């Protein structure tokens, strides 16, 4: 799994406008991105649980939250924004995938000074649990209306990533679930909610793919990571959200043709030495065994840039557990040349990473992470892949044949998939269900 430092995330999202739309799970997605743009540390449990605060890590509450009233009704609103010299990240809290409020959000994005470069979105749990017995059928219709409107409103350069809803625990105590009251529909059971979420994920994936939007299957990625669920069975801890951020950032980099640093997973468990909210600092440990990659005390650890600078050929040390070949003269492995991927154009140039052409659009193929995941700092390593190690990457779905660069000196930029123009009949408007 790709692991990035704050300095590398700042470069990747340089002059980018990122919009996050969703419920409280995606509020934590927004918070982790904002934190990772500034610090190499994880969210604290308090930061994950707090909602509607006036400020979080130098962001600003723009609407709702503590500026209004904190509650769990379907009309709850919360709009947050983090803005620096070269980064803009905004969050909109949603309780329904398409509604009059969502329409107002789309109009705001369309009329703003800066068009969004990335939209990260999911809405599912509220939709299938708070809107009556026919909530699933309404959800399907609203998804069709949403993606149709997205086709009309979003610029072709905008990358929309639809996230599937994450897995649920066996016991759900989330406060947003409806209670038995006043003769309305009864409280939904855990089994029924899980079944509805599965059906909603399948349908949203198909609908997003039909409209040529990207899908990141979070339900797949976290299906074996339930130990990172919070006690309410819905929300996730700081380690899960950092992995989620890495998945999203890797997806963006792949879409923009940016090559990220490759750090092989050889160190012990990340959680053994980093606690929530602790800035990443390399600490000595006695139980690590042979320090194959131990940094010299006179040479402090410095993370590599997104593309390694050219230098002397480096022969990588052998990995533990792999058979060592007999000593022999090895040809040098030249590193990639330094390429300027991140320009200093005016703030929020929405087409910074794109080259528009009429060539066939690219795609992603499916990948899989197996087992649990961990996080830890990585030393600089040469651009060399031992034959006994196989890297893995995010599960993404595009529906277009993927294009691979033919060499380290090839042009890495790739066209974004162009959505076919949608022509809606005059005078007809889709309305929220």
From Swiss-Prot:
Superkingdom of this protein's organism: Eukaryota
Region: Disordered, residue numbers: 386-433
InterPro entries: SGNH_hydro_sf
SUPFAM superfamilies in alphabetical order: SGNH hydrolase
Family: Belongs to the PC-esterase family.
Protein name: PC-esterase domain-containing protein 1B
Protein's gene: Pced1b
């Amino acid at each position: 799994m790709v692991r990035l430092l704050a300095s590398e995330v700042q470069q990747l999202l340089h002059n980018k406008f990122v919009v996050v739309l969703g419920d409280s799970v995606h509020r934590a997605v927004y918070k982790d991105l904002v934190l990772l743009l500034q610090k190499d540390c994880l969210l604290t449990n308090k930061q994950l649980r707090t909602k509607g605060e006036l400020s979080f890590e130098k962001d600003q509450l723009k609407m709702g939250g503590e500026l209004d009233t904190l509650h769990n009704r379907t009309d709850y609103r919360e709009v947050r924004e983090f803005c620096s010299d070269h980064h803009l990240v905004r969050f909109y809290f949603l309780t329904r995938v398409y509604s009059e409020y969502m329409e107002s959000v789309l109009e705001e994005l369309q009329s703003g000074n800066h068009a969004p470069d990335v939209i990260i979105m999911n809405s599912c749990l509220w939709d299938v649990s708070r809107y009556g017995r026919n909530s699933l059928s309404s959800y399907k219709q609203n998804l069709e209306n949403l993606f149709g409107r997205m086709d009309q409103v979003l610029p072709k350069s905008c990358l929309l990533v639809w996230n599937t809803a994450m897995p649920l625990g066996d016991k759900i105590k989330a406060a947003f679930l409806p209670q038995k009251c006043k003769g309305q529909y009864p409280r939904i059971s855990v089994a029924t909610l899980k079944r509805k979420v599965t059906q909603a994920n399948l349908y949203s994936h198909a609908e997003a793919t039909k409209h040529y939007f990207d899908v990141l299957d979070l339900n797949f990625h976290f299906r074996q990571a339930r130990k990172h669920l919070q006690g309410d069975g819905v929300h996730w801890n700081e380690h899960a959200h950092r992995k989620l951020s890495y998945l999203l950032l890797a997806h963006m980099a792949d879409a923009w043709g940016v090559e990220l640093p490759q750090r092989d997973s050889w160190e012990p468990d990340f959680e053994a030495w980093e606690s929530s909210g602790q800035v990443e600092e390399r600490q000595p440990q006695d139980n690590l065994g042979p320090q194959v990659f131990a940094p010299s005390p006179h040479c402090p650890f410095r993370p590599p840039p997104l593309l390694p600078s050219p230098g002397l050929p480096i022969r990588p040390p052998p990995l533990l557990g792999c058979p060592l070949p007999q000593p022999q003269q090895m040809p040098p492995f030249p590193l990639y040349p330094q390429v300027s991927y991140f320009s200093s154009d005016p703030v929020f140039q929405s087409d910074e990473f794109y080259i528009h052409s009429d060539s066939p659009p690219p795609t992603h193929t499916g990948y899989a992470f197996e087992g649990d995941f961990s996080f830890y700092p990585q030393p600089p390593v040469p651009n060399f892949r031992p034959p006994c190690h196989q890297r893995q990457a995010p599960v993404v779905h595009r529906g277009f044949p993927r294009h691979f660069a033919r060499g380290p000196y090839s042009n890495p930029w790739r066209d974004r998939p162009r959505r076919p123009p949608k022509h809606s009949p005059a005078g007809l408007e889709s309305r929220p269900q």
